[in-house]
UniProtKB/Swiss-Prot annotation:
GO cellular component: nucleus
Binding site for NADP(+): 12-17, 38-42, 59-60, 80-82, 138, 162-165
Family, per entry: Belongs to the NmrA-type oxidoreductase family.
Function: NmrA-like family domain-containing oxidoreductase; part of the lna gene cluster that mediates the biosynthesis of diastereomeric piperazines. Lna and lnb clusters encode sets of enzymes that produce overlapping sets of previously undescribed metabolites such as piperazinomycin-like metabolites or morpholine. The lna and lnb biosynthetic pathways appear to be part of a signaling network that controls the formation of sclerotia, a resilient overwintering structure. One primary function of the non-canonical nonribosomal peptide synthetases lnaA and lnbA consists in the reduction of L-tyrosine.
EC number(s) from the headed UniProt entry: 1.-.-.-
Induction of its expression: Expression is regulated by a complex signaling network which may include cross-pathway interactions mediated by sensing of the cluster final products or shared biosynthetic intermediates.
Gene: lnaB
PANTHER family, alphabetized: NITROGEN METABOLITE REPRESSION PROTEIN NMRA FAMILY MEMBER, NMRA-LIKE DOMAIN-CONTAINING PROTEIN
Record's keyword annotation contains 4Fe-4S: no
Gene3D superfamilies tied to this protein: NAD(P)-binding Rossmann-like Domain (3.40.50.720), UDP-galactose 4-epimerase, domain 1 (3.90.25.10)
EC category: oxidoreductase
GO molecular function terms attached to this record: oxidoreductase activity
Protein name: NmrA-like family domain-containing oxidoreductase lnaB
KW Oxidoreductase (keyword) present: yes
Length: 334
C-alpha cells in the first residue's frame, strides 16, 4: 500500500453512478475514498463505510459543507441527481446553482483532478426543438468548470443507457413487456422509437463497467484532460440487443419500433417518461448522437476498462467491457 494514498471524494456516491465509482476505487489500495451524502446513516452509506469508504455528511447547496467534504482531496467525481425534487420546485434553485457551489468548493479545497458526470447541450444541438433540462443543466455546469481553468485536469463523462434498467419489472409494460411479460402472440416485445442515425445505441452496465471507466481516468488524468468520455459498455441497435437476449435465454423476443417518430411514444402522463420521450426526440434529431456533436464510440471506454483491470491485477478475462449479450446471460439465462 502506498504511504501517500490519494484521496478521491465522490459527490453522489450513494447513487448508481457514484456507487459504481466508489466500489471500483475501493479495490485500489493506492486510493482513499470519501463519499458525500446528505444521510450518513442510510443503508447505502453504511455499506460503503463497511467497505472502507469515509462518509462525509453534506448538502450540495452548502458551500461550507462542500469545502469541508472536499478538503484534502486529490481528485473528485461529481454526479448530481437531476431528479431531486428540489429542482422541480417552482421558483426554486436549479441544478446549475448546486453545480456551481460544488465546483467552486472543489476549487477552493484544492482538488486537482475533477471527473464530472455531464450531458450534451440538447437545446443547442436541436436548434431549440428539444429541451432536456437535466442535460442542458449538466452541460452548463461542465462549461462553467472548463471556463475556470482551475483544475489540473477536468474530464467530463456521459453515461449511456443503463442495461440495469431492464431489471425493473414495474416499467417493462411501458416498453412492450420486454424482458418479462409476453404479448398476446407469446413474444417478449421491446417497443420504443428508433434511436436515429445508424441506430448505434450506447448501452452501459453501470454496475460492471462505469466505475472502472472512471477509475481509468484517475489512473492517468493528464491523458484524458478535457476529453468528453463516452460511458459505454456496448454499442448495439435495439434489434441487436433483443436478439442477444433471445440467443442466451431461448425466449421468443422481438423489437417493434414505435412509428412514425419519437412523438408517437405514449408517456401515460408520467413525468419520467416525458424525459425518455425527449431523449428519443434528441437522438432522432441529431442522427443518433447522444453524447454531443461527435459520433458515439466505445474505444475510449474499452481502454479505460483495460487500464483499471491491469492495475487491479484482475484475470485477463475481466479487462473487457461487458457486452449486452454477456450482461443478459449473467442475469436472465437459466
Amino acid at each position: 500500500m502506498s504511504p501517500d494514498r490519494k484521496l478521491i471524494t465522490i459527490f453522489g456516491g450513494t447513487g448508481k453512478q457514484g456507487g459504481s465509482v466508489a466500489h471500483s476505487l475501493l479495490q485500489n489500495p493506492d486510493f482513499r475514498v470519501r463519499v458525500i451524502t446528505r444521510n450518513a446513516q442510510s443503508d447505502a452509506s453504511r455499506k460503503l463505510a463497511a467497505l472502507g469508504a469515509d462518509i462525509a455528511q453534506g448538502d450540495g447547496f452548502s458551500g461550507d459543507e462542500m469545502l469541508s467534504a472536499f478538503s484534502g482531496s486529490w481528485g473528485a467525481f461529481v454526479n448530481i441527481n437531476s431528479d431531486d425534487k428540489i429542482f422541480t420546485t417552482e421558483g426554486g434553485p436549479t441544478e446549475f446553482d448546486m453545480g456551481k457551489i460544488i465546483v467552486d468548493s472543489a476549487v477552493q479545497a484544492g482538488v486537482k483532478h475533477l471527473v464530472f458526470s455531464s450531458g450534451p447541450p440538447c437545446t443547442e444541438m436541436t436548434n431549440g426543438r428539444v429541451r432536456m433540462k437535466a442535460m442542458d443543466m449538466k452541460n452548463k455546469i461542465e462549461q462553467y468548470a472548463r471556463s475556470l481553468g482551475s483544475f489540473e485536469t477536468f474530464t467530463p463523462i456521459g453515461a449511456g443507457w443503463f442495461l440495469e434498467n431492464f431489471l425493473g419489472k414495474e416499467v417493462a409494460p411501458v416498453f412492450g413487456g420486454f424482458p418479462y411479460f409476453p404479448d398476446d402472440q407469446g413474444y417478449l416485445t421491446f417497443r420504443v422509437p428508433y434511436w436515429g442515425g445508424d441506430e448505434h445505441v450506447p448501452w452501459l452496465s453501470i454496475s460492471d463497467d462505469f466505475g472502472d471507466i472512471v477509475q481509468g481516468i484517475f489512473l492517468d488524468p493528464g491523458r484524458w484532460n478535457g476529453h468528453f468520455v463516452h460511458g459505454v459498455s456496448d454499442i448495439r441497435s435495439f434489434e441487436q440487443v433483443v436478439a442477444d437476449f433471445a440467443a442466451v435465454t431461448g425466449n421468443k423476443a422481438r423489437f417493434q419500433p414505435i412509428l412514425p417518430t419519437w412523438e408517437a411514444f405514449d408517456t401515460h402522463g408520467i413525468q419520467e417518461l416525458e424525459d425518455v420521450k425527449l431523449m428519443f426526440g434528441f437522438t432522432q434529431l441529431t442522427g443518433g448522437r447522444y453524447f454531443g456533436p461527435e459520433d458515439t464510440e466505445v474505444d475510449t471506454a474499452r481502454q479505460l476498462k483495460q487500464i483499471t483491470g491491469l492495475k487491479l491485477g484482475r484475470p485477463e478475462g475481466q479487462h473487457k467491457l461487458t457486452s449486452a449479450r454477456d450482461w443478459f446471460a449473467a442475469r436472465f439465462a437459466n
